[in-house]
């Protein structure tokens, strides 16, 4: 590949075959990373964004069987917890007082969770934060929506419409892991299928709920699975335009059952992490304009590298992020806005606070 020429004409995009070849190409690593950085500069300039937000993982009780998850516990476990809607509202109020523009609300699949309970959570957050001007609610993965809708006897569109009416603004595109049913059969057997994930995300877009998109890699997948996953996301975005960002998530292996049982590798290498950012940018161009580094999973220094290899967003302040922590992430769960700005300035970027839709707030 002529990398300089491609950086100038990235709108032509690359084929699946070329994409796979880039992942397998170790000789041209720095050309790949540099090409992605050039494309990102053309699209986003020197701006590196971040969001002031709070994660609220409202329960770790889950009937799921995801083999990568160290967060879930059974109902009667000593460490089991469930934060009721009123308390979630209080947490959202605290977040708003501290300057957050977004709360991200997700939890395990507890048997009592239905659309009514999810709606009550949304209503409590809206009510609690209304005196302060409200807060953006980014909540409930496609799997959570599927689970709650089935418990309520509703179809997906009906469930999403009810959630939207009660205050849901956007939805995390999590529960994607790797969008390949053979991989999912080993990794998360009872989780929604690739087809179901796509349907729920597209339906959300069609009813006016934008989503993020994610990919968890570094476990049992091969490069071909990553490539297919990226193309699925690209095709969704070309059809709906409803994806706000792409967030690659490096597998946290230390406490993951599938790893300590000897059935998965110990996460990705730093080189693989940078390749994922770079090749995603080369493929997506400005179709999915925003690519986020996960500082909780990568650590600060590798996250900074990712921002020079095609990514343009540092993510959020988070305040609490229990899922990565449970799986063995050791880079903290909170970073203040000033510290984030310093991290971005240190690599010559221009830090800008954004909202969930990537509108600049300063």
Swiss-Prot record:
Residues 48-294 form the Radical SAM core domain. [4Fe-4S] cluster binds at residues 62, 66, 69. It is an enzyme of class 2 (transferase). It comes from the Archaea. Its cofactor is [4Fe-4S] cluster. It catalyses: 5-amino-6-(D-ribitylamino)uracil + L-tyrosine + S-adenosyl-L-methionine = 5-amino-5-(4-hydroxybenzyl)-6-(D-ribitylimino)-5,6-dihydrouracil + 2-iminoacetate + 5'-deoxyadenosine + L-methionine + H(+). Gene3D superfamilies: Aldolase class I. Pathway: Cofactor biosynthesis; coenzyme F0 biosynthesis. Keywords: 4Fe-4S, Iron, Iron-sulfur, Metal-binding, S-adenosyl-L-methionine, Transferase. Binds 1 [4Fe-4S] cluster. The cluster is coordinated with 3 cysteines and an exchangeable S-adenosyl-L-methionine. The keyword Iron applies. GO terms for molecular function: 4 iron, 4 sulfur cluster binding; 5-amino-6-(D-ribitylamino)uracil--L-tyrosine 4-hydroxyphenyl transferase activity; 7,8-didemethyl-8-hydroxy-5-deazariboflavin synthase activity; iron ion binding. Its EC number is 2.5.1.147. Belongs to the radical SAM superfamily. CofH family. Catalyzes the radical-mediated synthesis of 5-amino-5-(4-hydroxybenzyl)-6-(D-ribitylimino)-5,6-dihydrouracil from 5-amino-6-(D-ribitylamino)uracil and L-tyrosine. Consists of two subunits, CofG and CofH. This is 5-amino-6-(D-ribitylamino)uracil--L-tyrosine 4-hydroxyphenyl transferase. The lineage of its organism: Archaea, Methanobacteriati, Methanobacteriota, Methanomada group, Methanococci. The gene is cofH.
